[in-house]
Each structure stands twice: as C-alpha cells, then as structure tokens.
Amino acid sequence: MVRWLTAGESHGPALVATVEGLPAGIRVTSDDIAAELARRRLGHGRGARMSFERDVVELLGGLRHGVSLGGPISVVVRNSEWPKWERVMSPDPVDPAALAGLGRNAPLTRPRPGHADLAGMQKYGFDDARPVLERASARETAARVALGTAAKALLRQAYGIELLSHVVAIGAAEVPPGLPAPTSLAAIDANPVRCADQATSERMVAEIDAAQADSDTLGGIVEVLAYGCPPGLGSYVHGDRRLDARLAGELMGIQAIKGVEFGDGFTTARRRGSVAHDEIEPVGGVGRRVRRATDRAGGVEGGMTTGEPLRVRVAMKPISSLTRPLSTVDVTTGEAAVAINQRSDVCAVPAAGVVTEAMVALVLADAALEKFGGDSVEETRRNCEGYLKSLVIH
C-alpha cells in the first residue's frame, strides 16, 4: 500500500512530505524533484510570489545515490522567504514585544468568500484566519508534487506508463477535441498557459489579461492523460477499490478543485447508450487481441483500467483571493466589511495540471503495486510483464 503525508505551512520554514510503500530501485534525484517543482510555477497569470520565492529541495531519506531503497522517502521543500516570516510563523513561542508593530502579524479577521478561512475559524476556534490559510494554502501542493515525482518515475521505469496534463479551458476559451501525444509534454510546458493548441492558448492569455485588468480571477479545466496503463488496475469488487473512485477522491482533495470527470463524463449523460459506450473490436495478429474503437470512458470501466489511455479532467474554481475583495463580515465586530486581500495569482490553472499529474501518479502507483506487487522495480516490472503475457484476451 502506498501512503503519503505532508506537513507544513505556506509561510513556514519548509514543507515536509513522506511517501511509503514504493519499491527499491526507482531512479529519482533531487534535481528531478526540483524540475517538477519548477513546472508547478509555470503559467501566465501567476502572482508576484512566483517571481521571488524559490523551492529548495532536500532529500532526507529513502534514497541512496539517486536510487530508492524500499523504505519511506522523505523530502523537505524549504521556503526561501522564511527569514521574513520567522517571528510571525515561529513554531516556538515568541516574545510579544518582538511581534509588536509587525504588519505580517496583524490579525486577519475578515474571511474571504470561497476560501477555507471562515469555516476553518469556526471549526478550530480561531479568531484569526492566519492559522487556517497557512495550511489551506495551495503552497502545500509543492509537497505533493515532490512525492509525485517518485511515483512518476516508478510508473515509467517499471510499467512504461507516461503521464501528461494540458489545460483545456480557461474562462470562456476552450480547446477543440483532440488529445496530445505523450511526446508533447515539453511543448505544452513551453506554452504560456500549458495549452496544446496555440490558437486557444492566445485566447486564454487574453482572458487572463482581461480578468487581471478587472482585478478579478479565473478558473478553468485541466485534463490529465496516462498512456500505457495495463488493463485491470483497480477493481469492481468494492466501491473503495474502484480506480476512478480513488482518483476522484485524491483529485477533489487538491485545493480549489470543484469537479472531476472521466472520459466524456457529463457529456455521456446526455447521450443514448448506443453512442455513449466504447465498442470492442479485434486487432489483427497473433492471439486474441482487442481494443476499444473509441475512448469515451476515459480508459476506465467498472472501476478498472481498460488498456486505453486514462483520461480525467478536473475543474478548478477561480482563486478566492481578489485584489478587489468581495463582501464579508469582520469577525471581531460582526459588522459588514470587505475581505482581506492576500497576495495571490490571477489564474493558477496551468500549475494545477502539474499537481493533478502528481496525484494521478501516486494513485496509479498504489494500484499498480496492489496488482503486481514486488519489492523492487525489477520484480514488479517482471510481474507486470508476466501478467500481460498470460492474458487470455489482451
């Protein structure tokens, strides 16, 4: 079983992440993690924080000379801005005199609509939103991306599974139908909004610029693709073992994600059955080989991978920190007020794709190891190859 946890606050000294259950023999380095974290910072519409903050990666355990050992892998992502926040966010008590007059320490008493602020204050009994927003912040996703790097490496090295994400909608701009190839990732990352279609990309940039001019924010839709999944990952036996249920749960756990769909998703609900499902057809050659004529299901049927590309989309809401804040209530007075204005992005949809890749990778790694077992990359690869050779229908 692959398990993972993160710890740390947005303006704390560091984020800490641990993943347990990955086999020995995965080739992954701190440079690989740093490269993935750099991808997370991509995208037109990111805020000023992306220009001066740096993710400093340190591997604490689970690897030796760039190869996993089979034990828990632990990563620290240090916050380069920590010296500015050392007193305000100190884990240990601080003399009140040292905090006096610090603007960063001013209580945040006007919760933002759409954010965790108010519900978090109510739940944990805080009279200040700072403790809530520090942990609820999407900064935490840097730790998930770090762990997802190891999971991606396993999927690629053991099973030949390749992941990529691309932005399919921002505001009213949406790409035409079509899937990018696994080799398109570099070109997608080079695009200012991580969109595979240049014409749509230009409209997305214009949407972001218009929102910024209006002191507003934008959400959008990201699609994640996994190529090379063998059939049979997941199970139909119980709901919590269905792969799509497991993926949906983790993807909905990403900050600001409000919806998940597989394949054609909600569009399928408006179709007749005769044009909603993927017909199965024979493939020429040796053995009883089959394929789906289409991939409307998104590579998952009955909670299991079909062997077709896994295709899942996530909907990200507009960021709730606005430079022209919405109406709220000041919790200290109970009077109407405008919400606090925290430094933020106009649009973080391109970055959301990198985060969703990481979470899909962790879930697929768990499902693959559940299916094939193995304490090393070589063993689980051998088990997968044996399974594929043994399939009566494949």
Curated annotation (Swiss-Prot):
GO MF annotation list: chorismate synthase activity; FMN binding
Catalytic activity as recorded in UniProt: 5-O-(1-carboxyvinyl)-3-phosphoshikimate = chorismate + phosphate
Binding sites annotated in the UniProt record for NADP(+): R40, R46
GO cellular component: cytosol
InterPro entries: Chorismate_synth, Chorismate_synth_AroC_sf, Chorismate_synthase_CS
Residues that bind FMN: R135, A136, S137, Q255, A256, G302, K317, P318, I319, S320, S321, R343
Cofactor note: Reduced FMN (FMNH(2)).
GO biological process: amino acid biosynthetic process; aromatic amino acid family biosynthetic process; chorismate biosynthetic process
Positions of transmembrane segments: none
Key words of the record: Amino-acid biosynthesis, Aromatic amino acid biosynthesis, FAD, Flavoprotein, FMN, Lyase, NADP
Xref: CDD domains: Chorismate_synthase
Essential cofactor(s): FMNH2
EC identifiers of the protein: 4.2.3.5
Family: Belongs to the chorismate synthase family.
Record text on subunit structure and interactions: Homotetramer.
Free-text function comment from the UniProt entry: This reaction introduces a second double bond into the aromatic ring system.
Protein name: Chorismate synthase
Species this chain originates from: Frankia alni (strain DSM 45986 / CECT 9034 / ACN14a)
Lineage: Bacteria, Bacillati, Actinomycetota, Actinomycetes, Frankiales
